[in-house]
UniProtKB/Swiss-Prot annotation:
One Gene Ontology term from the biological process aspect of the record: protein targeting to ER
Description of how the protein assembles with itself and partners: Component of the signal peptidase complex paralog A (SPC-A) composed of a catalytic subunit SEC11A and three accessory subunits SPCS1, SPCS2 and SPCS3. Component of the signal peptidase complex paralog C (SPC-C) composed of a catalytic subunit SEC11C and three accessory subunits SPCS1, SPCS2 and SPCS3. Within the complex, interacts with SPCS2 and SPCS3. The complex induces a local thinning of the ER membrane which is used to measure the length of the signal peptide (SP) h-region of protein substrates. This ensures the selectivity of the complex towards h-regions shorter than 18-20 amino acids.
Chain ranges on the Lumenal side, renumbered to this chain: 115
Chain's role: Component of the signal peptidase complex (SPC) which catalyzes the cleavage of N-terminal signal sequences from nascent proteins as they are translocated into the lumen of the endoplasmic reticulum. Dispensable for SPC enzymatic activity.
Name of the molecule in the record: Signal peptidase complex subunit 1
Keywords: Endoplasmic reticulum, Membrane, Transmembrane, Transmembrane helix
Topological category with respect to the lipid bilayer: Multi-pass membrane protein
Keyword Zinc assigned: no
Cellular localization per UniProt: Endoplasmic reticulum membrane
Length: 169
């Protein structure tokens, strides 16, 4: 929670040390001396934590619209087993290649810093290639078994046979 008891609504709100809250209404702008700038001072106890539900209807803000989240939730996030293996091999290969190139360049230039920079760049590049679920990692989708009815529900508890393991002496 931000200083001043910010409720996540648009518009500035500040809390003084005494607990008084000054809330500026979003439609009204201007300096405090301006007649159109209106603030509402509320005295609240320090233990009170403001939430959008506890504010009066005039002060509460509407719920945020998840437009960006709807777009992100439509992206595929799964990766098949062969894709995971390919991503792991690519990750290790790029890291190894950048380490070798970085070591050789750092040795020739006699600058250890360049070795570190090249390895870090290889790590960033490998993360960019392997962490997102690119379509190359989803070429072999899993074939799930169909849902089967449970056969243990038909039998009564007394009809089940108890399997015992033989003792190994």
């Amino acid at each position: 929670m931000a200083r001043g008891g910010d409720t996540g609504c648009t518009g500035p709100s500040e809390t003084s040390a005494s607990g008084a809250v000054a809330i500026a209404f979003p439609g009204l702008e201007g300096p405090p001396a301006d007649a159109q700038y209106q603030t509402l001072a509320l005295t609240v106890p320090k233990s009170w934590s403001p939430s959008p539900r506890s504010l009066p209807p005039a002060l509460s803000c509407p719920p945020p619209q998840p437009a960006m989240l709807e777009h992100l939730s439509s992206l595929p996030t799964q990766m098949d087993y062969k894709g995971q293996k390919l991503a792991e091999q690519m990750f290790q290969g790029i890291i190894l290649f950048s380490a070798i190139v970085g070591f050789i360049y750092g040795y020739v230039a006699e600058q250890f810093g360049w070795t570190v920079y090249i390895v870090m760049a290889g790590f960033a590049f490998s993360c960019l290639l392997t962490l997102p679920p690119w379509p190359i990692y989803r070429r072999h989708p899993l074939k799930w078994l169909p849902v089967q009815e449970s056969s243990t529900d038909d039998k009564k508890p007394g009809e089940r046979k108890i399997k015992r393991h033989a003792k190994n002496n």
